[in-house]
């Protein structure tokens, strides 16, 4: 396994569309900072899983060499556009597809002009400055029928496949923490995690990540998803666990805060 860096980042577009909101801008700055750390680790490819790329029938991988378009987020469309220009390592993506099939996982590629790239993938690529011609990505979808364990297995499969090619890998899980949001308009300057119990759950999980106590972390994860209404069952973190073979030494939380009531964090893992 040749993973050189690993990160958890939020997929919300708010920090990037509304950096005038100080608390949201802090997420943007933190993501720019970890992007520098990612690139300093000198990966050959960046392996991305975003909870916002939904798949149902199969496990879908992005197999278009260059995806160039303008995206408008389905929730925050009033705040502007997200242009993107994303380069993928098609050979590695196709190798992952073949590895999935060999393991009994139905998989196929997406290679279409104007294919709808999800907000989370776009945000991660733009903020961290990856998905370039010099640093391409391999992007996996979030199959809605996969649970946390299946997501860990998928990540492990992808890492093994790419490592066999002798590539250095940076891995990213894109998604938030607690899932409750404000359901009425708020002053963004007064944003906070909407439920105190979810705020406490988020802080506990982040503290366990920092400690590197995987056993205690896994035990806490059993209840975290329900108690915090975690985004997509926190599968993006399980993606990281699977990619890292269930082990990391600790973590640095570069920023934690609220995004319209939900919790989110920018986390760098020590591997």
Curated annotation (Swiss-Prot):
Keywords: Aromatic hydrocarbons catabolism. GO terms for molecular function: ferrous iron binding; oxidoreductase activity, acting on single donors with incorporation of molecular oxygen, incorporation of two atoms of oxygen. It comes from the Bacteria. One of its GO terms (biological process) is catabolic process. Heterotetramer of 2 alpha and 2 beta subunits. Component of the 2-aminophenol 1,6-dioxygenase complex that catalyzes the ring fission of 2-aminophenol to produce 2-aminomuconic 6-semialdehyde. AmnA seems to have a role in the stability of the complex. Belongs to the LigB/MhpB extradiol dioxygenase family. This is 2-aminophenol 1,6-dioxygenase alpha subunit. It comes from Pseudomonas sp. The lineage of its organism: Bacteria, Pseudomonadati, Pseudomonadota, Gammaproteobacteria, Pseudomonadales.
């Amino acid at each position: 396994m040749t993973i050189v860096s690993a990160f958890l980042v939020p997929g919300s577009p708010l920090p990037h569309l509304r950096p005038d909101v100080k608390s949201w801008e802090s997420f943007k700055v933190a993501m720019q900072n970890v992007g520098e750390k990612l690139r300093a680790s000198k990966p050959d490819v960046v392996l991305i899983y975003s909870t916002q790329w939904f798949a149902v029938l199969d496990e879908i991988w992005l197999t278009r060499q260059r995806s160039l378009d303008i995206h408008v987020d389905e929730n925050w469309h009033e705040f502007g556009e997200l242009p993107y220009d994303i380069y993928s390592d098609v050979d590695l993506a196709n190798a992952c597809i073949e590895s999935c099939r060999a393991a009994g996982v139905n998989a196929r590629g997406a290679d279409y002009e104007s294919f709808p790239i999800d907000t989370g993938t776009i945000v991660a690529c733009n903020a961290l400055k990856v998905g370039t011609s010099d640093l391409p990505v391999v992007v996996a979808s979030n199959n809605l029928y996969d649970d946390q364990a299946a997501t860990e297995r998928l990540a492990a499969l992808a890492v093994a496949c790419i490592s066999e090619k002798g590539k250095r890998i940076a891995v990213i899980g894109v998604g938030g923490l607690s899932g409750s949001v404000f359901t009425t308009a708020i002053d963004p300057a007064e944003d906070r995690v909407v439920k105190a119990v979810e705020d406490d759950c988020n802080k506990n999980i982040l503290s366990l990540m920092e400690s590197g106590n995987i056993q205690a972390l896994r035990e806490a994860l059993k209840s975290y998803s329900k108690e915090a209404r975690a985004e997509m069952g926190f599968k993006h973190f399980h993606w990281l666990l699977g990619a890292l073979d269930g082990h990391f030494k600790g973590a640095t939380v570069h920023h934690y805060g609220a995004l319209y009531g939900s919790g989110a964090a920018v986390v760098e893992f020590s591997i």
